[in-house]
Structures are given as structure tokens and as C-alpha cells.
From Swiss-Prot:
GO terms for cellular component: chloroplast thylakoid membrane; photosystem II reaction center. It is found in: Plastid, Chloroplast thylakoid membrane. This is Cytochrome b559 subunit alpha. With its partner (PsbF) binds heme. PSII binds additional chlorophylls, carotenoids and specific lipids.
Length: 83
């Protein structure tokens, strides 16, 4: 026999008008906020990832792969010199 937690059943929540009034505003707002966050370039600045036109510079057109197991620090230093 299971106990009652006192919470409303999920079916009652999603069929209520109040739920849809609140979520018809918040869900599109979150979508628009996420779209603006990415389209303005703020996501690149916040997370520090390079913008699409910054992956390859004029000096370095190849993919920066670490190929050596024991000299990886030197390879990373070479890659970061171009930044």
C-alpha cells in the first residue's frame, strides 16, 4: 500500500487552464532568450569558445591535433602561440 504525498496528480496539472496560461508565456520566452543568446554571439563570449570564423587563422589552416604522447605539452604550446 502506497502513501499519499499530498501532491496534485500530473494529469490534473497539465489539463488546468492556469498551467497553460503560465507556460504559454514562459516556454516561448525561454526559446527566444536562447535564440538571442546564441545569435548575438554572447554564448561565444560567456563560454570562451571560438566563433566560427576564428577556428582557422591565416597562419594555421590545419586542424590542431595532438599526435605525440610524450611531447604533447610542446605541441599545445605551438598551437597556442598562434592565438
Amino acid at each position: 500500500m502506497s502513501g499519499n504525498t499530498g501532491e496534485r496528480p500530473f494529469a490534473d496539472i497539465i489539463t488546468s487552464i492556469r498551467y497553460w496560461v503560465i507556460h504559454s508565456i514562459t516556454i516561448p520566452s525561454l526559446f527566444i532568450a536562447g535564440w538571442l543568446f546564441v545569435s548575438t554571439g554572447l554564448a561565444y563570449d560567456v563560454f570562451g569558445s571560438p566563433r566560427p570564423n576564428e577556428y582557422f587563422t591565416e597562419n594555421r589552416q590545419e586542424v590542431p591535433l595532438i599526435t605525440g604522447r610524450f611531447n604533447s605539452l610542446e605541441q599545445i604550446d605551438e598551437f597556442t602561440k598562434s592565438f
